[in-house]
Each structure stands twice: as structure tokens, then as C-alpha cells.
Amino acid sequence: MTKIKLCGIKSEDDIKVINEVLPDYIGFVFAGKSKRYISFDTANTLKSKLDSRVKAVGVFVNEDIENIAHLVKNRIIDIVQLHGNEDESYINTLKAKISVPMIYAYQIKSKTDIKSVKNDTEFILLDAGAGCGETFDEALLEGFDNEYFLAGGLSIDNIKEKIMKLHPFGVDVSSGIETEGKKDAAKIRKFVSLVREVDNDR
């Protein structure tokens, strides 16, 4: 079954729909420059209302390790996603402080980027660029057999095709389930339904 991650969750209205469709993961974005940024306090409130079957992923860009450890310790997030240029030393230091899975996001623009992918974390995510809403050249994935989350430019218009062609471990969507910058309940329901439809047909 293809795992589903809905990223950029910001409001209690979003959580209500999430609890209805029950994706595997949601993403709280803690990168200050992102238009989907939320504070730690807001994330705490939203997590308290989230169905326990859905795991909350904290998305960070070069964040202070102590802040991440605080969020994990207080169970505001269940998984850590690193979306900056965090190096091996950073990852090892973070691993020593937390005991939850990590996702490392790679921006894929060339074959060289694919070759640079490492397995230093439990999961990897392949994206065209943080929050850009664009897809990357699928030909770059030829011969790549690691499990990964597919992100970048996914929507209700292309998700079935992407899953059938690329067979990712999971899919990660944000802008593709939004209308005018806000999460769209109808698009969320449709996206989740389409992913599960593909899985049921295989």
C-alpha cells in the first residue's frame, strides 16, 4: 500500500478532514520562510486533536537540534523530516538525542543528485525543490531502486499515473491539495481516494 503524507497542515479545519480520511502522515512545517509555517504552540494544539492513527511529521530546514528534540520529547511530532542542507554530523548528533524515525529530503535536478542519495535516515524523500510544486524528470529515477517518498507537483490530476509508473513507497503532497493557498477539503478527499484506488486495482 502506498503511504500517504499530506503536508503543510495549519488549521483545525484541516485536522477535521485529516481525521476523516486518515492518511498515514501529516506534515507540520517549521521552516520560518515557508508560507505554510506554523509555530510550535499551534502544532501542539493541532496534534492534540489529531487521530492517533495518523503520524505527525515535523518538517525542518537547518533547525536547532534542541528545538527538534523538544518537539519529539513532548510528542508534538512523531517523525522528523530534514529539508535543508543538514550534514552527516548534524544527523548523527540528532540521532543521539531522539528515538523517532527521520526522513531526509533530496532535491532532484540531475543524475548527480540521485547518485548523492544516502541511507543515513529511515526514509528518504525525493523532491523537485522545497515547496515549489514542480515535478522532476522521471528519467532520472532509472535504475534507482531505494524506497522513497515522491514529492513535487503531485495533484489529483496526475497522482494515479505517477504511482503506476514509479511505484514509490509513499507520496507527499501540499500545494496539490490547496486552492488559493489554503487546504481544500474536497481535493484532500479526492487525492487520498485516488491513491487508495490505485492500490486496490493492483
What are these regions (language model features)?
Residues 1-126, 131-202:
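Conserved N-terminal beta1-alpha1 strand-loop-helix module at the mouth
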